[in-house]
Amino acid sequence: QHYALLGIAAYYECTRDTLASRWLMEGYAHLENYFWDSRLLLEGYYDETNYDGSNPRNKSFNATVDAITTHLLYLYLMTEDPQYLQRLEELAHEIEVRLLGSMPYQAIGFVEKFNSNWGWNNNESLTIMGHVLKTGWCMGRIYQLTPQPDYLAAAESLVTHVWNRGYDQEYGGPYKDYNRLSGELLLWGLPDTTKAWWQMEQAITA
């Protein structure tokens, strides 16, 4: 659902169009009302709901990190409203606790899929180096807004992890997909190692 706001947020940033502003704020309100889990110690965005907004469930990398890059960061930069900074800090905390917190127990990367209570979904073992890099970029960007040393340390740790464990030191560029439990590079039937353009972009921004 976060990506539904990406284009609207970018358009509003460029034009300050009042209709785009209304769409953006209505979309943000929908996410806050139906997707945000406010339970103590379990805070975070749910991954999905039913079409009518009922039965919110599961959490994930996407539900957490993509909220930052699709709209929250830009809402704060455009308005300097402290409510958006507070949400960014809450998401930074979840990144530190849930994503980075899982890394010592993986062969590579971090857990990307969780149940509603942040329990690991070990039926999904995929970890993507572009996601690790994107998370590092987000932590660095939030550090620029509120310079807490642990945010910078987290950003450096994530980027260094990819450099040391998931980067092609011979030809350059981050590899793409791994099994986080075994550390196996996933080739998906291809005869050679897999990379992707968007992961190169994430590496540059990180």
Predicted features along the sequence, with ranges:
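Glycan-recognition and catalytic cores of secretory/periplasmic carbohydrate-active enzymes
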Residues: Q1-A206
